[in-house]
Amino acid sequence: MTQLSSKDVPSMGRRQFMNLLTFGTATGVALGALYPVANYFMPLRAGGGGGGTSAKDELGNPITKTGWLATHQAGDRSLVQGLKGDPTYLIVNEGGGIGEFGLNAICTHLGCVVPWDSGANKFICPCHGSQYDTNGKVVRGPAPLSLALAHVDIEDDAVLVKQWSETDFRTNENPWWA
C-alpha cells in the first residue's frame, strides 16, 4: 500500500473551507424554505382506490353512502370536505341517492363560502349577493363564473370526490377550474 505524499494531496485553505460551508448551509436553508412552496403548487393526492379524495364530515371522518343517506333527505345539499379540503356540497337527488356531481362552495367572486338557501332554492353568497341555481350555475353577479364541479363516486360504500375535467354540462364549455 502506497501512501500519498503531502505534496500530492490537494490542500484546502481555511477560507475555501468556510466558503464551502457557508454555501452549503445557505443552499440547505433555501431548499428547506422552497419545500412548502413546491408542496402548495403540487399537493399530494389523498387516498381513494380510484384516485379520488374521500369526502369527510366536519370532524374529518370519512363519509359513507349508507350513513349519509340515513341522515339526509332528497333535495338536500350539505357541506363536506372535498378536494384539497375545500368545502363541497354533496347533493341528494330526488331519487334518494347521492348525486353524480358535487359543487365547490367557494364563491367565484371573492372566495366566500356560499350557503344553500332552501327557501329560495338557490345558493346565495352572503358577502356580495351572488346567486347560483341548484346546479351551481351563476344566475346573478357579481360572481363571474359558476361554482366548480367535482365528480362524486361511490366505491365500497365510501363517498369519493374526484377532479372534474370534462365539459361543464351547465355551460357546454371547458371547465374554468381544471
UniProtKB/Swiss-Prot annotation:
It is a single-pass membrane protein. GO terms for molecular function: 2 iron, 2 sulfur cluster binding; electron transporter, transferring electrons within cytochrome b6/f complex of photosystem II activity; metal ion binding; monooxygenase activity; oxidoreductase activity, acting on paired donors, with incorporation or reduction of molecular oxygen; plastoquinol--plastocyanin reductase activity. The keyword Transmembrane applies. The chain crosses the membrane at residues 20-42. Its EC number is 7.1.1.6. It is found in: Cellular thylakoid membrane. Keywords: 2Fe-2S, Disulfide bond, Electron transport, Iron, Iron-sulfur, Membrane, Metal-binding, Thylakoid, Translocase, Transmembrane, Transmembrane helix, Transport. Residues 65-161 form the Rieske domain. One of its GO terms (cellular component) is plasma membrane-derived thylakoid membrane. Binds 1 [2Fe-2S] cluster per subunit. Component of the cytochrome b6-f complex, which mediates electron transfer between photosystem II (PSII) and photosystem I (PSI), cyclic electron flow around PSI, and state transitions. The Rieske iron-sulfur protein is a high potential 2Fe-2S protein. Belongs to the Rieske iron-sulfur protein family. This is Cytochrome b6-f complex iron-sulfur subunit. It comes from Prochlorococcus marinus (strain MIT 9215). The lineage of its organism: Bacteria, Bacillati, Cyanobacteriota, Cyanophyceae, Synechococcales. The gene is petC.
